[in-house]
């Protein structure tokens, strides 16, 4: 094992995040619980070539061909961290001549996927992002989130997904003690009309441990700087992944078997029993 990885090695046991449906009619809504974000890497990212120019000469500094952003492991880590809630149906977004927005979806679906905030003035004074409608909406997802004691979750717009026609707001919730269903606020791109397709990632859920942090500013140390500059000078070429990077694992347990007679499934135990 590499020295740097061995230096920071710890014994890890899997923590469990539970997605519990609030509605008994979940199967009729088309919703699936949030899944590992690694399943939602966008196709446009996958199509990016690994090198700036496959026919170019070797970079004399790195002794390798120049890599594109696809070789940046921290960006890939952002794409694949946590869990993603996807849209359960096609939503047709239409605008009137005055610019009023209307959302349309199959009315036989018993779950309302989108609605406006309960009070129109709820976001008054909040600076909305440029290029988006000033009035926000809510993703009405049907799951409660629950994590082990001492943990919280970050809910945010899918990392690096600037191509989506909406922007989901970020929030942190202590769902270890407040395992409630969250209504997720989002802004729609100005003048967007069209279909937001089923399977579109709506928001990313990342569990993290609550800990006390303090900041400090260290004095400049040239020897320290040169040491790390020399070690990390070829980050895109693989030095970071080879010497420093640690694998992050966000997986899902197999779904419990369903009784063919009653339709009942094995249930999760109390959160106190979750590691």
Question: What function would you assign to each model-found segment?
Answer:
Residues 1-181, 185-275:
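Non-catalytic terminal segments and appended small domains
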């Amino acid at each position: 094992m590499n020295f740097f990885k061995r230096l920071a090695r710890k014994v890890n046991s899997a923590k469990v995040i539970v997605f519990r449906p609030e509605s008994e009619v979940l199967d009729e809504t088309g919703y699936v619980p949030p899944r590992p974000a690694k399943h939602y890497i966008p196709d446009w990212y996958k199509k990016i070539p690994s090198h700036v120019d496959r026919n170019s000469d070797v970079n004399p500094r790195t002794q390798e061909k120049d890599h594109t952003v696809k070789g940046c492991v921290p960006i890939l880590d952002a794409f694949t961290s946590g869990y993603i809630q996807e849209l359960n149906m096609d939503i047709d977004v239409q605008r009137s001549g005055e610019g009023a927005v209307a959302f349309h979806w199959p009315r036989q679906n018993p779950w309302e996927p989108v609605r406006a905030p309960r009070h129109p003035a709820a976001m008054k004074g909040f600076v909305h992002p440029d290029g988006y409608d000033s009035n926000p909406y809510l993703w009405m997802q049907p799951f409660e989130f629950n994590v082990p004691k001492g943990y919280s979750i970050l809910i945010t717009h899918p990392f690096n997904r600037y191509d989506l026609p909406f922007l989901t707001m970020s929030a942190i919730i202590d769902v270890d003690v407040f395992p409630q269903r969250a209504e997720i606020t989002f802004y729609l791109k100005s003048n967007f009309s069209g279909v937001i397709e089923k399977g579109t990632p709506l928001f990313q859920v990342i569990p993290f441990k609550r800990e006390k942090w303090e900041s400090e500013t260290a004095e400049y140390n040239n020897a320290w700087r040169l040491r790390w500059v020399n070690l990390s000078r070829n980050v895109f070429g693989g030095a970071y992944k080879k010497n420093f990077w640690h694998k992050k694992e966000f997986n899902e347990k197999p779904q419990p078997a369903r009784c063919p007679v009653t339709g009942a499934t094995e249930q999760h135990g109390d959160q106190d029993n979750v590691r």
